[in-house]
């Protein structure tokens, strides 16, 4: 009985070994076994030829054979008496045969779906290639496919490893999308990038707004710093003219993009433009968006107004510092007119800085507004 159990264990190990090997290796093993079979047949035939005399002697000793047969019958009766003892090994053998059948069915199924399995295992590589080439929509399709596999086969170790690789790539995708926000983008591209971030990034809507406005502010500051070589403290007219133009173009563009992407106007958050304090020389050194961790939720409710207030402080600081140095009345009038049109553009996106400007420019700004209003009425 111990021998039978050992044989069953060896057979079970042999079958498990077969099921773990690739199909091509099984074919090779099959060919080797077939060759061994042929050798055994030839060996058996040779043995028959070599033992011919023994067989003849066996035929001449039929009495001994019949006696042996009688002994075999006796042994058979003994075997019948021990049937109950043999039941469990037989049952194990039957279960073993059932297991072989199941393994064969699984192996056959694996062979049939091998091309599909190969494609699934290549998913992280394809996803990474799409990220490297900025094919973001295709990357999200691969991500969705991976998560569908997770929903259906979440307990499978191969799928779990696949999902781990995909989630690592999603982090890489998110980082690359955030890097895209650091570049000047057209509205269509910007909407797509923010939409992708809503899917991939574990960020709230307020955090997305913060990231967008943070990089928008950095882009605006970069454009303004590029104007520094034009600055002449004794005659800053050229610098102010270019400065106002940059504010008009870039600030209008980024606020318009913000409204288009997030569906929120600065009018929704601002109480009145007049609530902005007159800036001083220390205002530009502060962080554009100061907040503490506990106040982040409250900050998310008025993030755009914080950005607009910072923009107002920036404009008012520069005008307060350099506008008095413009002595020529014609040049000053031209700058005020340009500033008026700049404010008109910003007003279209919900940012009116008339009141803060009136506090630092006084009657000159009020006269400009009055004269332009009179011209429109005329």
Swiss-Prot record:
BP GO terms, sorted: intra-Golgi vesicle-mediated transport; intracellular protein transport
Topology of this chain in the membrane: Peripheral membrane protein
Keywords: Golgi apparatus, Membrane, Protein transport, Transport
SUPFAM superfamilies: Cullin repeat-like
InterPro entries (UniProt xref): COG8, Cullin_repeat-like_dom_sf
Membrane found in the keyword field: yes
One Pfam family linked to the record: Dor1
Nucleotide-binding is among the record's keywords: no
Subcellular location: Golgi apparatus membrane
Cellular component aspect of the GO annotation: Golgi membrane; Golgi transport complex
Principal cellular location given in the protein's record: Golgi
Domain of life: Eukaryota
Oligomer status and interactors: Component of the conserved oligomeric Golgi complex which is composed of eight different subunits and is required for normal Golgi morphology and localization.
Stored PANTHER family: CONSERVED OLIGOMERIC GOLGI COMPLEX COMPONENT 8, CONSERVED OLIGOMERIC GOLGI COMPLEX SUBUNIT 8
Function of the protein: Required for normal Golgi function.
Protein family (similarity comment): Belongs to the COG8 family.
Protein name, entry field: Conserved oligomeric Golgi complex subunit 8
């Amino acid at each position: 009985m111990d021998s039978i159990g050992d044989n069953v264990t060896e057979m079970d190990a042999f079958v498990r070994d077969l099921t773990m090997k690739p199909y091509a290796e099984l074919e090779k093993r099959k060919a080797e076994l077939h060759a061994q079979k042929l050798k055994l047949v030839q060996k058996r035939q040779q043995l028959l030829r070599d033992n011919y005399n023994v067989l003849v002697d066996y035929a001449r000793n039929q009495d001994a054979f019949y006696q042996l047969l009688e002994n075999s019958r006796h042994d058979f009766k003994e075997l019948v008496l021990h049937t109950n003892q043999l039941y469990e090994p037989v049952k194990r053998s039957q279960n073993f045969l059932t297991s072989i059948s199941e393994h064969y069915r699984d192996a056959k199924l694996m062979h049939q779906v091998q091309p599909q399995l190969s494609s699934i295992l290549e998913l992280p590589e394809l996803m990474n290639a799409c990220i490297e080439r900025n094919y973001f929509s295709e990357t999200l399709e691969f991500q969705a496919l991976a998560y569908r596999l997770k929903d259906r086969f979440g307990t499978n170790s191969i799928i779990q490893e696949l999902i781990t690789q995909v989630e690592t790539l999603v982090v890489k995708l998110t980082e690359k999308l955030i890097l895209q926000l650091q570049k000047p983008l057209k509205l269509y591209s910007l909407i797509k990038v923010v939409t992708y971030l809503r899917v991939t990034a574990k960020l709230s809507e307020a955090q997305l707004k913060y990231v967008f406005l943070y990089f928008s502010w950095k882009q605006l500051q970069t454009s303004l710093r590029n104007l520094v070589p034009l600055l002449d403290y004794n005659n800053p007219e050229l610098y102010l003219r270019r400065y106002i133009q940059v504010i008009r173009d870039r600030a209008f563009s980024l606020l318009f993009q913000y409204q288009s992407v997030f569906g929120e106007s600065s009018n929704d958050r601002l109480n009145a433009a007049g609530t902005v304090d007159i800036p001083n020389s220390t205002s530009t050194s502060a962080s554009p968006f100061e907040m503490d961790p506990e106040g982040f939720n409250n900050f998310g409710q008025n993030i755009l107004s914080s950005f607009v207030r910072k923009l107002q402080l920036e404009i008012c600081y520069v005008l307060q510092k350099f506008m008095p140095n413009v002595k020529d009345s014609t040049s000053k009038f031209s700058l005020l007119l340009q500033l008026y049109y700049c404010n008109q553009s910003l007003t279209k996106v919900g940012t009116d800085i008339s009141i803060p400007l009136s506090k630092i420019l006084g009657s000159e700004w009020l006269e400009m507004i009055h004269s332009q209003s009179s011209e429109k009425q005329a």
